């Protein structure tokens, strides 16, 4: 675990450099703060910024020089005591231009503002769409244009939007400030126009400078596009703090919270309780007990459906319902086979850890319904290899039990949060609130893996397919060639299992130290508490 944590810290430091130290120094020479410095200055002193999508773009676009953190810093932070979503373009990465992952990350930030009814602050410093990849950024539903659709929807929802133009704001991006409730600009460095001086010259032959075309004075004194101008970054950020300070409160969801308490058991023991060998059984309850307040857990049906742990607890004072994979082998009582058995007799079945059995799916579905009934946020803890397979499972109705679990989870109206601590494979990812099921936050530990199946299983399957294909072409393959091919396939597949591979594509919001889990979940519930539940809980047509 320590090696994984060291790697996490190294990757974090590297990614936070954005376009590199020279580019950061260039920002300062222009009299500008960097994106991360702007965020740090903006949020309340002694508060922490909960970064979302730090590793977005990691390993992508190498042929274009890379796009660290997607070229934009996003997350949750307190501004004048108000929890806000913050979006800050990083001008050290291709002048803040939009890559495909930049669009995805910006839309994720707006999604968080919409679903949690949180004010959103845009610190704009972007050259617009990255033209070499414009076909992947411009025209589709979840591309650049979706941002302005979301601007309009956020406004209609009554969610406060504040935009500060602190650098370039060009082309379609110029609509963002004026579609926000408050639009500010920094003199000398901020500029906003549909077409810059070069494009204006080539299009209509007009020679005009950036300040005349779209500088602070022009837009505050002539066009009226911008509300107010400020001499530097800090004074502009101070103005944003004053805006938030005077903003009224909104109704809350009313989730239960009491005075927070730390776990009574040592949370650092998680590092040793989670085995390095991911097939080795362990007791997930020991992990849960080191994440929850007072290490106090009220189990739901503890003797039934034991391959899933369900129960009530508190995290940083917030009441939560926890659904987690049990990773140890459990001895379960099941219905005895018909014929010769006494009425009511039960048989014993050994159930493998990390596998969802029919009885566990049935239990979890009912538990999720109870949490919706009682307005308790749900926390899913994944270390899952999938659902049980085989004739016994099929005859027992594993498909309908799994469908019941998915229906209850997918239709939940209480906020959901997902923590991937180990494996997250196949349908198990779906059933325990993977990204497709709208968790408010989805975080991964460095020990996480996400894929359709494990690397070993996938490699063997892919090997069989490739060997059969070669033989169909009349080619022969020696045992040595087969082993080399297996190793190549395994290496390729294992690279895709990494939590950083998932984080680079925003399949998870963050890769975190396990000790940061409570902070992420608590802040996530605090955010969700700003959005009252207005939709009735209805699971629809559910199989029984």
Q: What do the predicted segments below correspond to?
A:
Residues 1-544:
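Ligand-binding clefts of soluble mixed alpha/beta catalytic domains
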């Amino acid at each position: 675990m320590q090696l994984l944590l060291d790697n996490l810290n190294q990757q974090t430091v590297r990614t936070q450099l954005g376009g590199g130290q020279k580019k950061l120094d260039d920002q300062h020479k222009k009299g500008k703060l960097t994106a991360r410095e702007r965020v740090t200055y903006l949020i309340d002193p002694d508060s922490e910024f909960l970064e979302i999508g730090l590793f977005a773009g990691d390993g992508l676009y190498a042929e274009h020089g890379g796009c660290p953190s997607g070229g934009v810093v996003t997350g949750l932070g307190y501004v004048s005591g108000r929890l806000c979503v913050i979006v800050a373009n990083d001008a050290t990465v291709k002048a803040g231009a939009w890559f495909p992952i930049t669009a995805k990350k910006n839309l994720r930030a707006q999604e968080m503002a919409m679903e949690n009814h949180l004010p959103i602050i845009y610190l704009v410093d972007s050259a617009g769409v990255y033209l070499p990849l414009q076909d992947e950024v411009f025209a589709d539903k979840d591309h650049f244009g979706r941002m302005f659709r979301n601007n309009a929807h956020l406004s209609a929802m009554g969610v406060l939007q504040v935009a500060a133009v602190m650098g370039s704001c060009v082309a379609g991006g110029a609509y963002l400030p004026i579609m926000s409730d408050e639009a500010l600009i920094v003199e000398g460095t901020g500029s906003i126009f549909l077409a810059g001086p070069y494009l204006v010259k080539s299009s209509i032959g007009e020679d005009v400078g950036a300040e005349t075309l779209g500088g602070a004075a022009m837009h505050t004194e002539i066009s009226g596009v911008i509300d107010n101008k400020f001499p530097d970054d800090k004074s502009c950020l101070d103005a944003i703090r004053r805006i938030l300070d005077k903003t009224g409160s909104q109704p809350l969801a009313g989730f239960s919270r009491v005075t927070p308490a730390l776990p009574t058991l040592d949370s650092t023991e998680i590092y040793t309780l989670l085995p390095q060998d991911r097939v080795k059984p362990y007791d997930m309850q020991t992990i849960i007990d080191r994440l929850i307040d007072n290490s106090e857990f009220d189990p739901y049906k503890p003797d039934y459906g034991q391959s899933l742990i369900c129960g009530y607890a508190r995290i940083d004072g917030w009441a939560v319902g926890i659904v987690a994979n049990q990773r140890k082998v459990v001895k379960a009582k099941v219905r005895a086979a018909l014929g010769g058995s006494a009425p009511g007799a039960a048989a014993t079945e050994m159930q493998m850890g990390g596998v969802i059995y029919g009885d566990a799916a049935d239990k979890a579905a009912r538990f999720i319904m109870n949490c919706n009934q009682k307005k308790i946020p749900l926390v899913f803890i994944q270390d899952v290899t999938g659902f049980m397979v085989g004739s016994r499972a099929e005859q027992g109705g594993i498909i309908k039990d799994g469908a019941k679990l998915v229906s209850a989870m997918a239709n939940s109206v209480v906020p959901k949060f997902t923590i991937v601590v180990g494996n997250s494979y196949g349908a198990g990812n779906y059933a325990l609130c993977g990204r497709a099921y709208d968790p408010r936050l989805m975080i991964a530990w460095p020990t996480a893996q996400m894929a359709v199946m494990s690397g070993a299983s996938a490699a063997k399957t892919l090997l069989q397919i490739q060997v059969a294909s070669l033989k169909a072409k009349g080619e022969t393959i020696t045992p040595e060639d087969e082993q080399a091919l297996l190793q190549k396939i395994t290496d390729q597949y294992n690279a895709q299992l990494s939590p950083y591979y998932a984080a680079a594509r925003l399949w998870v919001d963050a890769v975190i130290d396990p000790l940061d889990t409570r902070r992420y979940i608590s802040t996530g519930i605090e955010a969700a508490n700003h959005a009252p539940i207005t939709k009735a809980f209805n699971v629809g047509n559910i199989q029984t």
